[in-house]
């Protein structure tokens, strides 16, 4: 099953910095990440089907942060399609939090569920993108974090059950799923992970193109 984007459809992207990528907060812009590539390619292919593209992603957001602004930033816009990529900031949060707080997978899944429930009730079509982590060598800067082999190992152990939670929610709400973590692992097997993400978290231009291509495969 694919999503048919008819004339007048409103598509909303939301999440964290991977989706945000320098989106002006005071303008109706899609930013410089994969949403811009999706919108550009779609508009090029289908000039006869105008679609409204919205992006309310915010760098640094976790699921709990999305919850605080969900009504005003997402629900009040009454989008027909909502695409969500969140979880990278929930992953390994204890390595950044001064109190060392670990975000349990149950808390992550319950919060994510609360985001999806009102959208599903309204008949909104949903696209969930797995959070992902590529195995970059050495110590790299990922946002405000310095990530080395030990941190990366902790992050991966924390991320895997959260990916499974996204799978469970996609099944519960009959959402379309983009298995981004699996996709990047397969792509990195031939090129090395740095080709797709310099820090293991934020995609390169090629990484954003890969996400956009996977997204567009879900639409007609």
PLM features per residue range, with description:
Residues 3-29:
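Short glycine-rich His-centered loop
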Residues 4-7, 37-52, 65-220:
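Alpha-helical cap/lid subdomain in secreted, periplasmic
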Residues 14-16, 59, 86-88:
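Glycine-rich beta-strand-to-loop/alpha-helix junction loops that act as flexible
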Residues 15, 21, 56, 129-130:
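Short beta-strands and strand-loop turn motifs
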Residues 22-32, 57-61, 94-103, 200:
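Acidic/histidine-rich helix-loop elements
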């Amino acid at each position: 099953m694919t999503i048919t984007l008819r004339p007048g459809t409103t598509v909303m992207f939301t999440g964290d910095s991977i989706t945000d990528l320098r989106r002006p907060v005071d303008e109706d812009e899609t930013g410089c990440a994969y949403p811009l590539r999706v919108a550009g390619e779609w508009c090029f292919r289908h000039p006869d089907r105008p679609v409204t593209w919205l992006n309310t992603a915010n760098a640094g957001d976790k699921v709990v942060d999305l919850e605080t602004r969900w009504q005003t930033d997402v629900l009040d816009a009454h989008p027909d399609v909502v695409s969500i990529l969140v979880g990278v900031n929930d992953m390994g949060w204890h390595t950044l939090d001064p109190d060392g707080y670990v975000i349990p997978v149950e808390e992550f899944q319950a919060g994510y569920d609360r985001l999806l429930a009102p959208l599903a009730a309204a008949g909104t079509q949903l696209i969930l993108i797995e959070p992902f982590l590529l195995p970059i060598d050495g110590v790299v800067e990922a946002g405000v974090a310095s990530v080395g082999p030990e941190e990366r190992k902790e992050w991966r152990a924390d991320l895997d059950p959260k990916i499974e939670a996204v799978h469970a929610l996609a099944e519960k709400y009959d959402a379309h799923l983009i298995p981004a973590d699996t996709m990047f692992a397969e792509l990195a097997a031939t090129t090395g992970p740095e080709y797709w993400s310099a820090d293991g978290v934020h995609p390169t231009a090629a990484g954003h193109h890969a996400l956009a291509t996977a997204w567009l495969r879900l639409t007609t």
